[in-house]
From Swiss-Prot:
Keywords: Cytoplasm, GTP-binding, Hydrolase, Metal-binding, Nucleotide-binding, Ribosome biogenesis, RNA-binding, rRNA-binding, Zinc. HAMAP family: GTPase_RsgA (MF_01820). This is Small ribosomal subunit biogenesis GTPase RsgA 2. InterPro entries: G_CP_dom (IPR030378), NA-bd_OB-fold (IPR012340), P-loop_NTPase (IPR027417), Ribosome_biogen_GTPase_RsgA (IPR004881), RsgA_GTPase_dom (IPR010914), RsgA_N (IPR031944). It comes from Listeria innocua serovar 6a (strain ATCC BAA-680 / CLIP 11262).
Amino acid sequence: MLEGQIIKALSGFYYVFSEGKIYQCRARGNFRKRNISPLVGDDVEFQVENKTDGYILDVLSRENALVRPPVANIDIAILVFSAVEPDFSTNLADRFLVAIEKEDIQPVICISKMDLATDAEKEQIAVYKEVYETIGYDVFVTNDEPDKEAIKDYISGKTAVIAGQSGVGKSTLLNSLNSDLTLKTAEISNSLGRGKHTTRHVELMPIGDGFVADTPGFSSIEWDDLQPETLQFCFPEMEDRRSGCKFRGCMHDNEPNCAVKTAVEANEIADFRYKHYIQILQELKNRKPRY
């Protein structure tokens, strides 16, 4: 019996990487009865039938798992946003960050297409970059060679997911990190301002000593399992100040003597970050319950 990691799931087969080899495996027949559904990224125990095929016997415990994309055991999330085409959006960036923070996955922000931006756009993005770095996020510009090497170092020995709108340059970034990938890239559709989807399934691809999951592009994020009272924990600069609020259950909205609102007024917390927090908070409060 061997242990390995699922790097691709396609047409009922699971492709398991173990000791430098890839095995095409099927899941045991009793998995469905046991309500076990293997995911890309899962660590598994499997039995080899021949040099290339085998059966998955068990799925080992998961550190975490995303629903969309369906990937397990993620160490870091590389969030790619373009400077232009489509334009950089702090609203979208913060929503992606919340989606990743709530899963306790370390996010890394990458900004692509900076070479296509005007001087004014570059100046504005530099301001946003400083805000996110002050919070504690690492921000890289994918056009810069030193930053590409830093991204490779981040991925080394880890499983990462790369996410962002379609058309922002995720596949281009992966191709630049590993020239053997030759992933398809897409231009932006002029009518919708969105990229054509070029990634059809989730697959872990080797980048140095690590793996990265390229995932279908998406521009909307759902908060099905996020509660209003836990949203503040997805904003690190707010979580750091919550102990200074007068009320223990302060949600930093209409409550008096709120340390977070005081920090916003003192420009210690970026106004746009607080604005997005309130927007998402209201969405969560107004969400219709699902039965």
